[in-house]
Amino acid sequence: MSEIRSELKYLSSHEWARVEEDGTVTIGITDHAQEALGDVVFVETPEVGSQVSAGEEAGVVESVKAASDIYSPVTGEVIAVNELLEEAPETVNESPYDEGWFFKVKPSDVSELDGAMDSEAYVKSVEDDS
């Protein structure tokens, strides 16, 4: 079974979101998603300063098997991207929840995450997909 962390919120499209102490939201893909993708070879993140919308495409992750869109769980301004992924996209496979995050957003309304799944709901969602 993939690692699923209890402190995160999850989307059915397999992104995770973590609300930081300063109110910003860090976004990445789940351990389950990186396992399904296989070896990640390229990550495209939104540009710092750009606006993203909840439920809309914000980037792309490509592996040896497939390319998948990355969706933002919140609306807001992109304040940081993980530049490490440009040089070492495999970091997503090695550390999807820590070193392999994709981008950070200053949300216009953090309550948009209220509709995201908690870890228990995400586990059930993954099991139902299997």
UniProtKB/Swiss-Prot annotation:
Cofactor(s) needed for function: (R)-lipoate
Keywords: Lipoyl
The keyword Repeat belongs to this UniProt entry's keyword annotation: no
CDD domains documented for this protein: GCS_H (cd06848)
Domain Lipoyl-binding intervals: 24-106
NCBIfam families recorded: gcvH, PRK01202.1
UniProt organism field: Teredinibacter turnerae (strain ATCC 39867 / T7901)
Cofactor details (free text): Binds 1 lipoyl cofactor covalently.
Any one of the GO BP annotations: glycine decarboxylation via glycine cleavage system
Protein name per the record: Glycine cleavage system H protein
InterPro entries per record: 2-oxoA_DH_lipoyl-BS (IPR003016), Biotin_lipoyl (IPR000089), GCV_H (IPR002930), GCV_H/Fam206 (IPR033753), GCV_H_sub (IPR017453), Single_hybrid_motif (IPR011053)
Homology family: Belongs to the GcvH family.
N6-lipoyllysine sites (modified residues): 65
